[in-house]
C-alpha cells in the first residue's frame, strides 16, 4: 500500500493497521506524512499500542560489549511462547557509546534508564529513541513543564537492588548508613519516600537477597540453596503483611552444575525465571521452572547473538535480563 492509498483510509482503520507494526516500522511511518506522525505520537494511539503490547510481554537482554568499539547490545524476545523465548525474527540492536559501562534499570512502560555515574539516558529499545541527561532529580515526561525538580529523603540510604514499579510506586532495596538493609518506596504522584519494614533481620540485600516481582506482588527472595534446591521468599500481601514461602526445585544441583542463580521473578504463565549470577567461558543460561508440572527448562542465550561477538566474559563485561518488557511509542 503506497502513501496516497493509506492517507485515503478512515483514521480508525489507519490506527488499526499501525497497531500491528513494530516500533521500528512506526518510526519510519512518522516520516511518511505529518498525519501519520500525528497519529503515532498521539496520546490515544500510545495507550492503544501499549495495551496491545501488554498481551505479549518480552524478555529484554542488555549487554555491554567490551571488545572493539564500546557499545550496548539490546535484544527482546517473547517470553511466554513456544519455542521457548521465541525471538520472532527480531535482530539484536547495538548502540555505540563512549562510556565504558552503562547499567540499565528495570523497564517501565517500554522505557529503560541507563546510568553511568552521573550520566543518565532514557532509552526506548524498540524505536531506538533516547534522551540523555546529566541530572538525577525528578523529571516528568509529557507534563509540558520539562524541568527537573530536586527532592529530599529523610532516610539517608544507598540503592542496592533493581527498581520495581507497582501501582504508581517505585520499590527498591537499599542500605542505610549503618549498613542495615531497607526496602524503600517512592510514590511517583506525591514524590515522597517511605520505608517498608522488612520481615526479619536475615534479609540482607548484600548477602544473596534480591527484590523481585512474584506473581504481581513485591517479594524479597534469597538465592536458591545449591544443595537442597530451596528458594526462600517473603511476599508482601495487599494488607502490607509479609508471608513466608519456600519452593523446593527438584534436580536443581544437577541442572545448575553448582552455579549460583538469581531469581528474576515470574512471568504471565506463573513460571519462575532464573539466570546465572556469574559466567566466564560459558554463555549465560536462563532457567524456567513450572511449580505445577515441576518442569525445569534451560535456554542458552548464545543462540540469540550469532552475528555478534561470542557471548562470553571476554566479549561482554555485563549482561542484564529483565522480564515483562513491553513495546511503546515513547520518544518517537
From Swiss-Prot:
Protein name, UniProt field: Putative F-box protein At1g70390
PROSITE patterns: FBOX
Highest taxon, organism lineage: Eukaryota
Coiled-coil region(s): none
Cross-referenced InterPro entries: F-box-assoc_dom_typ3, F-box-assoc_interact_dom, F-box-like_dom_sf, F-box_dom
Domain F-box, chain residue ranges per copy: 3-52
